[in-house]
Amino acid sequence: MKSIAIVYHSVSGTTHSLAKAIQQGVNTFSNDNNNNNIEVNTYRILPQHIKDGRFIEKDMLELITKANAIIFGSPTYMGSVSAQFKAFIDATSSIWSQGSWTNKIAAGFTIGSHYSGDQLSTIQYLQTLANQHGMLWVGLDDSGLQESNTPNTSGASSGLITCTHNNELPEEALLAAQYLGKRVVKVMSGF
């Protein structure tokens, strides 16, 4: 059985909602295509997972490492991932030195309070993380230009980028998150 790990940090709950929508997209696509051999797990980085600025959940890292694909998610804070997500990233250095994530599928998602809130920098940071680990990055193949009802309303192709509207997620963001989950399954099925 193949598996997907969605690892993310969320403070206000919007990144959590995106992670759950991605999980729903994976499950829906798998069920619709009679592909029940894909397991998807979410791993939320919580305050108790950080001690003295360091991510300390080695068991979580081991579970994530067992996955065939990893989808990274963080809110955009000051043009990058949150400090808590950065602590998780720093904890992957031992995984990097062993090459344990090499050739795994990777994707990413982020949310900010404004569309011009430098979310692309966050996605590029996640993409760099994946590249350093030798992972294969999956972006969105929907530019948002083909039709007006596309889920990718930001037009970003590197990953899922969205923003809140009055601290709420627009329906399009949840649809785009589901689409990202489906896309990762499609790509993963080719390996």
Give residue spans per PLM region.
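N-terminal beta1-alpha1-beta2 submodule of the flavodoxin-like/Rossmannoid cofactor-binding fold
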Residues: 1-100, 147, 153, 161-191
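Short, glycine-/small-residue-rich phosphate/pyrophosphate-handling segment
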Residues: 105-151
